[in-house]
Amino acid sequence: MSNLRTYLEEKNPDYTTGALYYGYMDMTYFAFTPSNLKSRKLKIAVVYLHEPNSFEVWLGGNNRKIQAEYIELFSNKGTGGYKLSRVSPGVDSIIESTLSEQPDFDNPGELMRQIESKVIECVERIVFILGEQLER
C-alpha cells in the first residue's frame, strides 16, 4: 500500500494524498482526492480489504452529516453503477466500487496501473454525476 500511495501521488500531483492508515486489522487505506471533490468536503479512499483480499475505491465525506447528505443526493441522481451505501453506524463510505479482486501481487507495476486507471475513472464518473467539470 505504501508503494501504491507513492506511485499515485507521484503520477497525479493535482490530487491530495493522505497518510496511510491501518484499520482494525481488516483494512488499510489512504485518501487520494482531487481539489474539486475536496472543496465539496468529499474524499476518495483507496482501500485494501484484508479478508476478501481485494482493493476498493470509496467516496466518503469529511463527516457523518456530509456523508448522509451525499447518500441522499446520489439516491436521487443515481450512482453510475456504483454501490450506494446506507447511513448507519460504522459505514464510512457514500459510494463503493471494487478495483481488483484477488490482486496479482507478483506483478506490482501492472496492479498499480490498473488501480490508478480505475480510481481516476471512478473520480471522473462521480464528478460527472455531480455535474462539475473535472479540472485536469
Question: Which residues are covered by each model-predicted region?
Answer:
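A short, terminal or domain-edge coil/loop segment
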Residues: 3, 65-84, 111-115, 135-136
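Short, solvent-exposed polar/charged micro-motifs at secondary-structure junctions
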Residues: 25-32, 93-98
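Charge-rich, low-complexity N-terminal segments
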Residues: 1-28, 36
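An amphipathic alpha-helical core segment
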Residues: 71-105
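Solvent-exposed, flexible loop/coil residues
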Residues: 34-36, 41, 86-88, 103, ...
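Contiguous interface-forming segments/domains that mediate binding rather than catalysis
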Residues: 13-14, 52, 89, 116-117, ...
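Long, solvent-exposed, polar/charged low-complexity segments
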Residues: 1-8, 99-136
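Aromatic- and glycine-enriched beta-alpha-beta binding-site module
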Residues: 28-76
